[in-house]
């Protein structure tokens, strides 16, 4: 029972992290690249620790949205600032996911706006079943998503025979681990704060944080090493994953496009879960109706380029969230002084 609960939260974490930006390779290439092996190892350690602290606080305050967790972590005044920041973050990153969905479904000869409409309809339908529906769909989609990504990356490596090495004297990009962790930890705060009341104990928090961190770290390392090999040709592709798939059988290309759609869908759902949970504190409407209104507001902004949105928004959020990451890392020490 403990392991099942831990795996349930692990899948929720991975669903919020592995989105269009990550699965497409844009996010990894934006932050890492050459000389980043140590950065990814450091990121994995910080992510595991930070995720556990978020779940610990969420369970302690029995939260249903992220404001109580922020208030416990950094005090009421700063919490209000980060409350607004997270709302904007969830809105804009979910908007990026939807734009990525439109781009990806074009691979199936579906017009951009038709693809976006399809994603919005399927998303609203899922929210008719609320949180239970999301957890159920995650238990099916996330294993398929992780397996698909690893299969594509390992298939590429098996045909190119590249040797992975971490030369500690050539790891100048290690600071990227800090900004990448701070970017991703905001998603974790937003999503896991919504389910603090549903947790039964801290054992499941330990399982979820360690398992999700290790899986995310391994995929990030393999993906980054693959993109480093392809560095010379990446500028020709809107989506780096398609550079990895170049020359692969057409069936694999179609399967990975489907995996990319799954990544977009799960992250869109996770972002809207966090956003709707916060808005339900002062908007008394069914969750699915709030989600529908949010999607209607987001769609006009998707006309901006997918890669342009990621290149502009993600580094800014990574820098803004450094203080939040510091609060999480120092929480065990500072909480003893209170």
UniProtKB/Swiss-Prot annotation:
The lineage of its organism: Bacteria, Bacillati, Bacillota, Bacilli, Bacillales. This is Uncharacterized protein YyaD. It comes from Bacillus subtilis (strain 168).
């Amino acid at each position: 029972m403990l392991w099942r609960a831990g795996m349930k939260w692990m899948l929720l974490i991975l669903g919020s992290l592995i989105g269009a930006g990550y699965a497409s390779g844009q996010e990894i290439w934006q932050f890492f690249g050459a000389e980043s092996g140590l950065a990814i190892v450091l990121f994995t350690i910080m992510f595991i620790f930070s995720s556990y602290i978020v779940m610990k606080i969420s369970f302690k305050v029995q939260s249903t949205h992220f404001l109580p967790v922020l208030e416990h972590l950094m005090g009421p005044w700063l919490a209000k600032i980060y409350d607004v920041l997270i709302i904007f973050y969830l809105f804009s990153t979910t908007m990026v996911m939807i734009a990525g969905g439109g781009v990806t479904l074009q691979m199936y000869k579906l017009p951009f706006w038709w693809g976006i409409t399809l994603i919005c309809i399927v998303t609203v339908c899922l929210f008719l079943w609320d949180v239970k529906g999301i957890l159920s769909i995650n238990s099916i989609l996330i294993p398929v998503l992780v397996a698909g990504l690893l299969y594509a990356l390992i298939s590429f490596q098996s045909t190119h025979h590249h040797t992975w090495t971490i030369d500690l004297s050539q790891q100048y990009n290690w600071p990227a681990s800090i900004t990448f962790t701070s970017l991703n930890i905001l998603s974790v705060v937003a999503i896991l704060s919504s389910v603090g009341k549903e947790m039964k104990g801290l054992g499941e928090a330990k399982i979820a944080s360690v398992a999700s961190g290790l899986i995310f770290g391994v995929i990030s390392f393999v993906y980054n090493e693959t993109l480093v090999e392809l560095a010379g040709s990446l500028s020709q592709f809107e989506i780096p994953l398609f550079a990895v798939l170049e020359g692969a059988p057409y069936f694999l290309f179609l399967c990975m496009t489907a995996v990319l759609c799954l990544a977009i869908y799960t992250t869109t759902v996770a972002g809207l879960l966090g956003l709707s949970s916060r808005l339900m504190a002062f908007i008394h409407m069914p969750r699915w109706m709030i989600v529908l209104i949010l999607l209607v507001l987001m769609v006009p902004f998707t006309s901006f380029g997918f890669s342009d949105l990621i290149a502009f928004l993600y580094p800014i959020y990574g820098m803004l969230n450094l203080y939040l990451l510091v609060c999480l890392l120092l929480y065990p020490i500072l909480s003893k002084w209170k």
